[in-house]
């Protein structure tokens, strides 16, 4: 009997060990998928900015104000994407948020590869800025909006995934920042010299398609976790506690965030006016700005 008991215990230990190894491997694979998705999303988000601005630049005679207006538009679109992600994370059920976002991404994919609108002929004098904002909104607005929401959404999905590190998903922000910096620094030195605009647009569209597949995989990992809905409840409690933050605190945060953004636009406009309006001078200040986060 003792031999049978020992054999049974050994078999159980082997199965338990195998289960733990499988769970560890699955957890690592899930972490890699979330990190790669965030890195890819950030790369697409920051490569499309100089790309589309360069597409528009010839229509405005190489004006240095093109990048300044484009930066303001992209920052506003980024804020809109974050607000959309916040609304999904806070109000939508855990199972519904990925569906809504994937539908938005699918609608954005229909606009790819992006191009200048057919009506975007040479702007009339006096309406240059309005023309530029309209072209940006129609030409690249929805793909940029959908991509900008991925960072907060993926971090929220990871926090509900049941992963051992799910309680602190903010380390994934490092993958996002890495993708942003690599994309910005590689654009003037590698992407722009090696590829024409048509090729860049095609590569971006392919990258967006791959990103959608990764988003679907991350959503499946999140929804398949038994802890998903428990994590959703914990997030709700955290949201309730966050309501103690005063309006004054929120206004101070907004004001402090406005200062570096305004300085970025002012400094970039200054150097592109005095030197040249080119992607190299566009991305270096923005990359420096991101590197200070």
Where on the chain are the PLM-derived regions?
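Alpha-helical transmembrane segments of multi-pass membrane proteins
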Residues: 2-293
